[in-house]
Structures are given as structure tokens and as C-alpha cells.
Regions:
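A short loop-to-beta-strand structural motif that recurs across blades of beta-propeller domains
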Residues: 75-77, 120-122, 163-166, 214-217, ...
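Repeated scaffold domains used in trafficking and secretory/extracellular systems
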Residues: 51-56, 95-102, 136-144, 184-191, ...
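Conserved beta-propeller blade signature
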Residues: 64-67, 108-111, 150-151, 197-200, ...
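Blade-level signature of beta-propeller repeat domains, shared across WD40, Kelch, NHL, RCC1
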Residues: 639-665
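Beta-strand-rich domains and repeat architectures in extracellular enzymes and scaffolds
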Residues: 45-74
Length: 665
């Protein structure tokens, strides 16, 4: 995607380079920026990351209907394959992910997430119609039976019965059909024939602790009878990822696993005709069929696979977008068409094997600011993470450039030489970007597949190591990772806070790494603290706490460890003597910051000052009393908690709404 110069930024910065340098120019020394005479100086820098991230695609005739992800309002666009242009845009009044998508009779059916108490099922036939609501659900998948009945499933947090299969019809509205897996954390796939509806469940989020693994259920539509038809080879996998009816004689089922599996069933009696592993693949997502040829895509590696139904042969047909996470696959004659989450459409000519790709924004998709994932800054560059990309803001030039990154850059850190390191979800590991050398971010090291969700990445100034805290969505727990930049060899310490706690917070100081724990499940231990020698790879101490909540962020300033809990409580630990045998950490001062802090706040130690950020506000903490002084109200829109960065001149960067701002405190 070419450099863009947002009009919003032009309005805010005027002449671009001159304005940026005059407002954000470096002070004489690399120290925290001096406060303005009348409080903080705040400069708007335009949308943090403006793009068209996506999460679904369904082909109707010659148009690929593509659902957005993390945009407000949520929307669906029509991409016309013959011309390579976006020809329609439909905005939805509710929702965040447009994840469920299915066609029937030339009509598009949709399901969305994040629509509490409002419609999360829609139909579009040239006019958008709200159909109703699956109660309490983030809708993950929808399917339409031959008679027009719409089926849906999703994630219903806290529901004792587990994820349900729901049906919508004009006569009955939305009704519950079955809830056969109370210990699964979400429903992920549905399909329907004239006689049966199918539900695929599992626990790829908030797993562990006895959560159900992959389960496939057939529901007889006439009687409501439920039968577990999970193929044996799939039972050990994490979740059923896709169920697709491919004619009267074939039902294709895929999983997320290590590796992923595909099973082919006879819809008449649900016999398993064939099942096989897909090597090197975490998730298989979308199917298409013509005669004895089956095509399918994978999420993490961008591979388009071909399977011969007659011989059983399996081969990699193409990699249309390297490392592109696939969210849709269609066929128009001799052309396969798919999409990847960073806003790319690809086509493959089955006759010639030629692959073409198209950026959706260049094709006319309405780019908009997406929810932020991460932020980092140095040397006049600010990076804002999103879905499938980083936005690189060049402050001097006044430009923004899209850097493709598969998945989500959950946290980022810039080294003194300007090299950016990223912890990337899901199961993407550690990535690197060297400005002026790397044309795009590159993967430098893999992590174990189950250690899929980096929460934090920090640099230890004493050892030069990168320190990561990671969450394992599928098994529970997490890991503490140390990594020497450039080595390609991370050291992974699994479950350093026990098998149930993820490592949400990491801080470095005094030659130690300090870890803070949380728990993705509603019950179980959380809030533990630990200290590690990152070079020796050994625990120095560990303690449970009475914080009553998970630890969201940690920072070291002087001889004090400062922390914030996920519900906005500040605390301190005196680190004097923390490396001596017999040291017993004690929670010292405490303060309730609920008045200024939202969920999952973060800390940043900068020079002698301590700053905090939440979706509600940017604030300064008094080192002695923990009293908070609000610097800027934010009402920020992040995907998983606010982030805060500082450059070498002491200028702070975060989001206000979805706009990137620079703050000279």
C-alpha cells in the first residue's frame, strides 16, 4: 500500500514536517519532556491504524461480500471479482467483528460480535434487515438450511449450559436448538442440510481446567435429537473450526490443532469417509469443491491446499499471501478467490496457476481507524498495531505507511538502534522490523504453538534480553520467554506462575525480571508475583498475593516495584534485598484508582516519573502516595486494554478515541 497523508493529520499538523518538529522537537537532553506552562501539550496525529481489516467473506454470483473486523461501524463491502473494485458498502448498526457469513438464494446472512442486548443477526438482499439476537453471544458462524432457516453459534461467556446452537425463522424468531457441551468455551462452526443441523465446539479461548476439546454434534431437525459424531482423529484437537456441506454426498469438517485435521463425512449416516492431518498447519478454515477436487485454506501460514477425493493425495497448491490468515474462500468458474485479515483479496487461476493480489483500500474499500493493539515510538517513528498490519507514522514527513504483519501485534518495543520487536498473536511468535533495512516485518523466532497470545514484551537493559509474558489460550496458563535479539532461539519457561495463571505483566530492573499473573477463567488463582534471573533462567522468589485480581502491569522505579491490577488498583513492593536468600516480598502501599482507570491499565516508568494509561485517561502517579493526576482524558478504543509508549525525548504516545496523540507531559 502506498504512503498516505490523512487529511485529519494535515489539519492538525499544518505544514507536516515543520509543525511536527516544532511541536514534538527533542529537548536538549534525552530526558522526560518538560511540562507545558499550562499543562500537557497534546498533538493529534490522525488515525492510529486506518485500514480495512476483515473477518469473513462469502461469494454471491461474481461479488465477494467481505465483513469487517474492529471497525466502527461494522460494515460489509462487495468486491466485484471481474473488475477488481469495491462496488458496495453496507454499514451495520451493531457489532464489532462481522464473523458469521453465509449465502442462500442470493441473499447474504450475517452474524456479529459485541452487540449486547441488540441484534446480532442480519440479512442483506439490497436492504439490510435485523433478524434478532442470539442471547449473550459473540456470533462466530452462521449457516442456512435449504428451507431458509438460519443457524448460528458463538461464544456466550459465563453461560452454564455452554455454547448453544440457535435457529432463526420468520415464524419463530430466534430459538435455542441445543446446548450439548456445557464445558466448551465457545461454539465455532455450524452447517445445515434438509435433515440435520451441525454444531462444532471447543475451547480455543479460556481453555484448560477441564474445558471441552473439539466436539462435533448432529441435531436432527425434525425431532431435536442430538448425536455426538466427532471423528476419533479430531477429539484431541482444540476446537472444530469449520463445517461445510459440499453437495449431497460430502460433509467437510476441520479443526484447530497441532496439527489441524480434516475429516470427510457422509451426510446420510455420518460415517467418516476419510480423516487426515494437515502438516505444519494450526487451523483449516474454508473449503471449496469441484468434482473430486477439494480445496481448503489455513489461517496462520497462508497456504492453499488441494486434496484429491479419489486418490487421497494432498498437496500445497499455492501460497497466495505468505503468512496471510485466511477468512474466506470462493470459486467463480476457473478462479478461486480468498481474503486475508490484513485487507487483501487474492485470486488463483486454476488453469494457469497464476496468483494475483489486491489491497482492498486501493480497490475502493472505505478505510477507517481500527481498534488499537499496541504502540511504540523512537527516532521520529511511531508504530500502531492493528489486525494484519502496523501503521508506521513518520512524524517528520507527516506520512503513514502500512506494514503487513500476520495476526495481531499485541505488544511492541523499540531497541536503541531503532529495531522494532513484536509479540504477535496467534501463535506467530517474535517478529522484527529494521527501518531502512527490512521492507516489511519478518519473523525472527517461533514460540510453542500453544503459547499463542503475547501479552507484553520488554527489554532488560542489564542483559539486553527481550522479556515476554505470554498467555496460552487453549491449555490455560502461559509462559515467561527470554530472547536474545537476532538469535532465533527463545527460551520458554512454561507456567512460571502455575498451570492456571498467564503472565500478563513483565518488568525489568536490578538484573531481575518481575512477573505478574492473571487468569483467563472466571475462577482460579490470579495475582501472583515472581522474580526471575533472566540470564540464568531461574526463579528467585514467587508469592501469592491478596490483591484479589490479576496483575495488569508492572514497572520498576528506583528500589520499588509498582503494579496495577486489571481492575485499577495500584500497589508497591519494596525491592531492597530482593536478590538475597530469604527475601520475602510484601505488598506495601495500595491505592484504588477506579476513578481514573478503566480495565487493564498499564504503567510506564520514564526518568523519575511514573505514568499510567487506561481507556479512560492518561495519568501521572505520585511515587510516594500513589495518588493519580489525570493529564488527558482519552475515551480510548483499544482491543485489549490501553497502551502507552515514550520516545527517547520523553514524548508520550497513546490513543484518544482511535486517534494517535502525542503528549508532552
Amino acid at each position: 500500500m502506498p504512503d498516505v497523508n490523512p487529511s485529519r493529520r494535515q489539519l492538525l499538523l499544518g505544514t507536516g514536517a515543520v509543525a511536527a518538529l516544532s511541536v514534538l522537537g527533542p529537548p536538549a537532553a534525552a530526558a522526560p519532556a518538560a511540562p507545558g506552562a499550562h499543562g500537557p501539550e497534546v498533538t493529534g496525529l490522525g488515525p492510529g491504524n486506518s485500514d480495512f481489516p476483515l473477518m469473513s467473506a462469502t461469494l454471491i454470483d461474481d461479488t465477494l461480500w467481505i465483513g469487517s473486523r474492529n471497525l466502527a461501524p461494522a460494515r460489509v463491502i462487495g468486491y466485484h471479482l471481474p473488475t477488481g473494485r469495491v462496488t458496495a458498502t453496507v454499514e451495520l448498526p451493531t457489532g464489532n467483528f462481522v464473523q458469521g457469513s453465509a449465502a442462500h438464494g442470493g441473499v447474504l446472512h450475517l452474524g456479529v460480535t459485541d452487540a449486547p442486548g441488540a441484534a446480532n443477526l442480519y440479512r442483506y438482499d439490497g436492504t439490510l434487515t435485523a433478524l434478532g439476537s442470539v442471547p449473550g453471544a459473540d456470533v462466530r458462524d452462521v449457516a442456512v438450511a435449504p428451507d431458509g432457516t438460519l443457524y448460528a453459534t458463538g461464544r456466550q461467556k459465563g453461560r452454564a449450559a455452554g455454547p448453544g446452537l440457535y435457529a432463526w425463522s420468520p415464524a419463530g424468531g430466534v430459538t435455542e436448538v441445543a446446548s450439548p457441551a456445557p464445558n466448551a468455551t465457545q461454539g465455532r462452526a455450524v452447517a445445515a442440510t434438509a435433515t440435520h443441523a451441525y454444531l462444532g465446539v471447543g475451547s480455543n479461548l479460556a481453555g484448560g481446567g477441564g474445558a471441552t476439546r473439539a466436539g462435533l454434534y448432529a441435531v436432527e431437525r425434525a425431532t431435536g435429537a442430538v448425536t455426538d459424531i466427532t471423528p476419533p482423529d479430531l477429539r484431541g484437537d482444540t476446537i472444530i473450526r469449520r463445517i461445510t456441506v459440499l453437495g449431497d454426498d460430502l460433509l467437510a469438517v476441520s479443526t484447530e490443532g497441532a496439527p489441524a485435521h480434516v475429516a470427510l463425512l457422509d451426510p446420510a449416516d455420518h460415517r467418516v469417509l476419510r480423516s487426515f492431518a494437515v502438516p505444519g498447519t494450526k487451523s483449516v478454515t474454508n473449503f471449496q469443491r469441484r468434482g473430486d477436487t477439494l480445496w481448503f485454506t489455513s489461517t496462520e501460514h497462508g497456504v492453499l491446499w488441494r486434496h484429491d477425493l479419489a486418490t487421497g493425495a494432498l498437496d500445497q497448491l499455492a501460497v497466495p499471501v505468505p503468512d496471510g490468515n485466511s477468512w474466506g474462500l470462493g470459486r467463480l468458474g476457473d478462479t478461486l478467490a480468498g481474503v486475508t485479515e490484513g485487507g487483501t483479496v487474492w485470486t488463483l487461476d486454476l488453469g494457469t496457476g497464476a496468483v494475483a493480489t489486491r489491497d482492498l483500500v486501493e480497490a475502493g474499500a472505505p478505510a477507517a481507524a481500527q481498534l488499537g493493539m499496541s504502540v511504540a515510538a523512537r527516532a521520529g517513528r511511531v508504530y500502531v498495531g492493528g489486525n494484519g498490519s502496523l501503521a508506521l507514522h513518520d512524524l517528520a514527513a507527516g506520512t503513514v505507511r502500512k506494514l503487513p504483519v500476520p495476526g495481531e501485534a499485541k505488544d511492541t518495543v523499540v531497541l536503541d538502534d531503532g529495531t522494532l520487536y513484536l509479540g504477535v498473536y496467534s501463535s506467530q511468535g517474535i517478529w522484527r522490523y529494521r527501518p531502512g533495512t527490512d521492507p516489511a516485518p519478518v519473523k525472527e523466532a517461533a514460540l510453542p504453538q500453544e503459547q499463542n497470545r503475547p501479552q507484553v514484551i520488554r527489554r532488560d537493559p542489564d542483559s539486553g534480553l527481550l522479556l515476554l509474558g505470554v498467555q496460552a489460550d487453549t491449555t490455560g496458563g502461559g509462559s515467561f520467554v527470554t530472547y536474545r535479539p537476532g538469535s532465533g532461539r527463545p527460551t520458554v519457561h512454561t507456567d512460571p506462575l502455575g498451570p492456571e495463571q498467564l503472565v500478563r505483566a513483565v518488568a525489568a530492573g536490578h538484573g531481575q525480571a518481575f512477573l505478574g499473573g492473571d487468569n483467563a477463567r472466571p475462577t482460579g488463582p490470579r495475582g501472583d508475583l515472581a522474580a526471575w534471573d533472566p540470564v540464568a533462567g531461574r526463579e528467585l522468589w514467587r508469592t501469592a498475593t491478596d490483591l484479589g485480581a490479576g496483575v495488569s502491569s508492572l514497572a520498576v522505579l528506583g528500589n520499588t516495584l509498582y503494579g496495577l491490577t486489571v481492575n485499577g488498583r495500584a500497589f508497591t513492593v519494596d525491592l531492597c534485598g530482593s536478590r538475597r536468600p530469604g527475601y520475602a516480598p510484601v505488598i506495601g502501599r495500595r491505592a484504588d484508582l477506579g476513578a481514573v482507570s478503566g480495565a487493564n491499565p498499564r504503567l510506564l516508568a520514564l526518568g523519575g516519573a511514573l505514568y499510567g494509561v487506561s481507556e479512560r485517561s492518561l495519568f501521572r502517579l505520585d511515587r510516594d502516595t500513589l495518588a493519580a493526576t489525570v493529564l488527558v482524558g482519552l475515551d480510548a478504543e483499544w482491543y485489549s486494554g490501553a497502551r502507552l509508549a515514550a520516545d527517547e525525548h520523553g514524548v508520550l504516545y497513546t490513543l484518544r478515541g482511535r486517534e494517535l496523540i502525542a503528549v508532552r507531559p
